[in-house]
Amino acid sequence: MIEAKGLTRTFKSRKRTVQAVRGVDLTVDDGEIVGFLGPNGAGKTTTLRMLTTLLRPTSGTAMVAGADLLRDPLAVRKRIGYVPQAIGQTQGGTSDMCLVIEELLDQAEAYRIDRAEAVRRAAQLVKQLDLTGLDQRLVKTLSGGQRRRLEIALGLVHQPPLVFLDEPTTGLDPQSRSNMWEHIRALRADLGTTVFLTTHYLDEADALCDRVFIVDHGVIAATGTPDELKRQVSGDVVTLRVNGATEAARALLAMQPIVRELSVADEELRLTVEHGEEALPVLLRVLDGAGITMSAISLSRPTLDDVFLTLTGRSLRDDSPGGGDAVGAAAELAGAGAGTGSKE
């Protein structure tokens, strides 16, 4: 669905040159949900804007949805959906004073979809994205979650096989975020849509993505499933306290081949193991066999933030949402795709 090689984007600012994206290589297969995870300024949105034809690469190539990004950007635009970053609160403007159904039908018209088919698709999207009963309301009256679902619907009007979501849940409350995750999962389950999303939320990447690209300073630092990435960190951590035999327990556990690291602090033993769930019963049997009883035990696993910390030397910092009207930007892409006079 996506194959990019050496994507680079350089910006000139006064007397200096800034390389926002530096030689990104990536592949996305049909039907995947993949995530670009990284902090503000990592190059996530710049990469996404290149892949959606809104920003021309300084160098590099890409095939997107079967079309050449550089040679035939119009074909790319016709085959993708793009939902840019939300601004959180309505800022006013013509789209805010339109009805939800009008926004959907106008978007369909931008893609030159005939009226009857546009009405059918709009009704389908209203149902699929839980907008039932809202189609006759003004856009400005929608809640943040409702507006975000409308923006996704606008990106799906022309039934693209691939949709790009830029920070899809930024600014939403926890319940709305969870609800949005279900809708994103449904894009693949119900429509077979391939989803490429950017996010700075660790839990979002973990919960939604088949694969994650960790991005920092314009390069891909690592890629893999969330579990694969976590396994790159030192391992699961077992923390335990024993009843009056800490030194004996330490000596015994240090001999076990499954224990990669062991430390003791304040009578608490901290063990690093490869697979915590499998190692835990083994360790318990070893201690029990030696007559050592425990007073407390816990198991913790690495997080994607631990992965980011290991790869970059710092924790994933908070990202700031971008500006711009997301509804208007989605229409901009449709207009760019339909404005050349070419027909599908």
Feature roles, as predicted:
Residues 15, 32-34, 158, 246-248, ...:
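Residues that cap or initiate secondary-structure elements
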Residues 275-344:
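C-terminal coupling/interaction segments
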Residues 106, 124, 251, 285, ...:
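Surface-exposed charge patches
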Residues 75, 102, 117, 228, ...:
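An acidic, carboxylate-rich microenvironment
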Residues 81, 112, 130, 234, ...:
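A generic structural signal for secondary-structure junctions
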